[in-house]
A protein has these predicted regions:
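Bulky hydrophobic segments
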Residues: 1-130, 140-142
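Compositionally biased, low-complexity intrinsically disordered regions
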Residues: 134-136
Length: 142
């Protein structure tokens, strides 16, 4: 385990992951005929979803978790490439939809955009939080 990481449960991140999972499921089913919008946006959101799942259970800095989520996307893409190279076929239709079946550089771009979206979103979230202020003196100012 990377130094500074601890197991924990973050309910807000878990709720975000569940909500995003529902959105991804709707995108995969209802939006099945939306072509590249469904597939590209789905890949962008998939990295964000993996990040939220990691964040829900692992307390760590943003960058390592975001890189891990991006890495999961790259591993899926590598798996697709190797499956095509070795002419392997995933028999389960649902798993084939989730994992995809064709390696594509556009998918890697979508994963990179998802990674950047995670970093930007976390930066905006942290910027909106109140800063810890220095303790005030109990001595009255004259």
């Amino acid at each position: 385990m990377i130094r500074g990481m601890r197991w924990r449960l973050a309910p807000l991140s878990l709720a975000g992951a569940v909500a995003l999972f529902v959105l991804l499921a709707l995108l995969a089913t209802v939006g099945a005929r939306w072509g590249w919008v469904r597939s590209f946006l789905g890949d962008v959101l998939a990295v964000v979803w993996v990040y939220l799942v990691f964040k829900a259970f692992i307390e760590a800095r943003v960058l390592p978790l975001a890189l891990a989520a991006f890495g999961v996307g790259l591993l899926v893409e590598l798996g697709q490439y190797l499956a095509a190279t070795w002419q392997l076929h995933i028999p389960n239709r649902a798993l084939r939809i989730v994992l995809g079946s064709t390696a594509d550089w556009w998918d890697v771009l979508a994963y990179a955009i998802g990674f950047a979206a995670v970093l930007a979103g976390e930066a905006l979230f942290r910027a909106g939080r109140p800063k810890a202020s220095a303790p005030r003196s109990s001595m009255p100012v004259r």
